[in-house]
Amino acid sequence: MNLSQIYNKSPSFISIWKITWPIIIANLTLPIVTATDTAVMGREQSSTFIAAIALGGIVFNIIYFSLNFLRMSTTGLVSQEKGRKNEEEIKKIIRLTLSIAIAIGFLIICSSYPLIEIAKILISGSEQAEHLMSEYIFYRSFASPATLMNMVFLGVFIGIGYAKFAMFQLVSISILNAILSIV
């Protein structure tokens, strides 16, 4: 096989760009949630609320970053099976990764108190900020199953080539979260 044959079989810049631009746009919306939470807490009398959101946010950023393998592995496995045109295997992958996401999500909920104690040891703030951080971690842990399931769905959509739907999903969730934080 010569170079021109390889070039003709490789995806074009345009076909790659069609997949990547929605993902780029979607990821640009993610800071909206933090900015909204900060703005809402900034209206409170004390800066302690902003500190608590920041400290608790660090905890969940680390957790979710560590679990990003759910999206990445789902994307890779689903795209391979899509290339093989194996819908049954795609369904199995979705069931398996959703089961893993739900199990880990409930594990995070059940571990919220030890997680809070570890966070207090590793992240220091004022006594009031740590108390509010504890509440934030406790309540936000209940969103873990849905957050992790969302990672799986994003992986599926990207894996089957529906990057625009993944973008719509992330943008919608970010906007909805911002609206609900304000209300």
Predicted regions and their residues:
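Residue-level recognition of pore/gate-forming positions within transmembrane alpha-helices
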Residues: I23, P31, I58, L96, ...
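Short alpha-helical transmembrane segments in multi-pass integral membrane proteins
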Residues: M1-T20, V78-P145, V183
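Hydrophobic/aromatic residues within transmembrane alpha-helices of membrane transport systems
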Residues: I25, D37-M41, I53, V78-G83, ...
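Residue-level signal for short hydrophobic patches within transmembrane helices
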Residues: F13-I32, T36, V59-S66, F142, ...
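Alpha-helical transmembrane segments of multi-pass membrane transporters/permeases
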Residues: V156-V183
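Small-residue-rich hydrophobic transmembrane alpha-helices
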Residues: I50-C110, T147-G161, F165-A166
